[in-house]
Design a protein with these regions (language model features):
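Acidic/histidine-rich helix-loop elements
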Residues: 49-76, 104-109, 150, 273-299, ...
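N-terminal carbohydrate-binding accessory modules
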Residues: 11-91, 309
Length: 391
């Protein structure tokens, strides 16, 4: 996600008395008995440290560490990550934007920034959590842009960044997962969020992303050590399901001994009109009922397609981002959504990561669950619903 508004935390939890977690029964699919599928199963459910290390600025910062809390308003603490683990989350997705913190032709990352990222990563590793580390909001023409004109530039940037990250985190075991890039897309075009495979520029973008992903795998594997066998995640165009379901998307090749260690990354805030669209926009809806097909159909169809193309063919899938924004206190619908989404994902053999941007007030993308100021769960019933079906 790209929402940048910093919101103030309220002092008390949202009242959720009278809200019930629905009973959801989805017949589980046959999941291949492979190490990769078991690995994703063990990731259980994850939580995104959103609007934090992924924050970016157009201004020069004397203290670039302050960017960490410039969007979310709070510096990350061990107490926060401990609370995430205690709630039952087993994976931390750690989105990081790097371009405000690099210098020189080889994009040398600021030691202070890299140290701070590692410090927070260690909070989760010390809690025996999985951590997904990525390149996040570096998706523009100066850094990573998926067209042929910028292909060489993009490959250069990603190579130098991933060489440094692979070196810094190479001694960590498989609990640390590398994700090539976040939501690669044609920024500021009509196709930014709408992939049209009849458009030449979209086909070209998909082909460039294929090259990025292959280069990412090659660069990481080449560094050896634990990186030679580390689990790696790769997205398609804008990390959408369509981005990996179209015929032009190609999964990177890997060494024979690493079969099943490339994880397909998908972001899916669906159904869109409920989960992501602003409440003030036309066609936005604020109701979701886990027992009604009209609510669940988009989720069912996406899961089925991902299962058919990937899971059934022993290729693991991770939903790197999902969630439903608060729309004027529609808590019961969000609880229904959380329960159904996770129940479906687990039945189809996938793990999911809720996008939490610490946003609770205003008219922006209100995906916050953990109030980072008070380190309390503002919507414990949503968390309970996620955990009930994540096993």
């Amino acid at each position: 996600m790209i929402w940048q508004q910093k919101t103030e935390s309220a002092e008390t939890e949202t009242e959720d008395s009278g809200v019930a977690i629905p009973e959801v029964v989805i017949e589980p699919k046959e999941i291949p008995d492979t190490d990769g599928m078991k690995f994703v199963r063990d990731m259980k459910i994850g939580w995104n440290l959103g609007n934090t290390f992924d924050a970016i600025t157009n201004a020069q910062k004397e203290d670039d560490l302050s960017i960490e809390w410039s969007w979310c308003g709070e510096k990350t603490t061990k107490e926060m990550i401990d609370a995430v683990k205690a709630a039952g989350f087993k994976t931390l997705r750690l989105p990081v934007s790097w371009h405000n913190h690099v210098s020189g032709d080889h994009y040398t990352i600021s030691e202070a920034w890299l140290d701070r990222v590692q410090e927070v990563l260690d909070y989760a590793v010390d809690d025996d959590m999985y951590v997904i580390l990525n390149i996040h909001h570096d998706t523009d023409k100066e850094y990573c842009y998926p067209d042929k004109e910028h292909l060489e530039q993009s490959l250069s940037y990603m190579t130098f960044i991933w060489e440094q990250l692979a070196d810094r985190f190479g001694d960590y075991d498989e609990h640390v997962i590398f994700e090539s890039i976040n939501e690669p897309r044609l920024v500021e075009t009509d196709h930014e969020w709408w992939l049209d495979m009849n458009a030449a520029e979209c086909v070209e973008a998909v082909e460039c992303i294929n090259e990025w992903n292959q280069n990412f795998v090659d660069v990481v594997r080449k560094t050896g050590g634990n990186n030679a066998t580390r689990y790696l995640m790769v997205p398609g165009y804008d990390a959408s399901a369509d981005g990996v379901l179209n015929d032009k998307f190609v999964l990177p090749t890997d060494t024979a001994e690493n079969e099943g260690k490339i994880l397909v990354s998908v972001h899916a805030y669906i159904p869109y009109h409920f989960a992501l669209q602003a409440a003030t926009e036309n066609e936005s809806i604020d109701q979701f009922n886990a027992s009604e097909k009209t609510s669940t159909n988009d989720i069912d169809q996406m899961m089925e397609k991902l299962y058919a193309k990937y899971i059934s063919n022993e290729i693991p899938v991770v939903i790197g981002e999902f969630g439903a924004r608060d729309k004027n206190g529609n808590l019961q619908s969000r609880v229904d959504y959380a329960a159904y989404y996770i129940a479906a994902a687990r039945a189809y053999g996938m793990s999911c990561n809720w996008w939490d941007n610490n946003a609770f007030t205003g008219d922006g993308e209100l995906f916050g669950l953990l109030d980072r100021k008070t380190v309390t769960w503002r919507y414990p019933k949503i968390v309970d619903a996620l955990m009930k079906y994540a096993e």
